[in-house]
Amino acid sequence: MWWVFEHQRLEKQLAKAPMELQKRYEKWKDIVEISGPAGLLLVRGFRDEALREEWKGYRSSRLNQQYRVIYQIKGDRLHVYVVEVTPHDYRRES
């Protein structure tokens, strides 16, 4: 069993997102909690991938054509830290 931790601003981001996207995120979260990030690779629609450059060390999964969930696997512990759900804009906020 994996633990999913969410950044404090995630609740606000999801509240602004369409209901369909919120449901898709909950499905994503269920898969991660049960199977871990490896389970995401079995679902082609998520197109889970490692990020590069300033997001090196993070991963991204598609929730729909526009929105992505950006997350990080914390060490060898069974923890996934969700940073944000974004409309495909990977610029880091300070």
Language-model features, listed with the residues they occupy:
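A short, surface-exposed loop/turn module that caps and links secondary-structure elements
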Residues: I34-R62
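Arg/Lys-rich, positively charged N-terminal/basic patches that mediate binding to nucleic acids
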Residues: M1-E33
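Enriched for short, Lys/Arg-rich terminal
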Residues: E11-K16, E20-Q22, R52, S61-S94
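A broad, low-specificity signal marking well-ordered, structured residues that form hydrophobic/aromatic
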Residues: V4, E49, V80
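Residues that recognize and position ribonucleotide moieties
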Residues: W3-V4, R44, V83
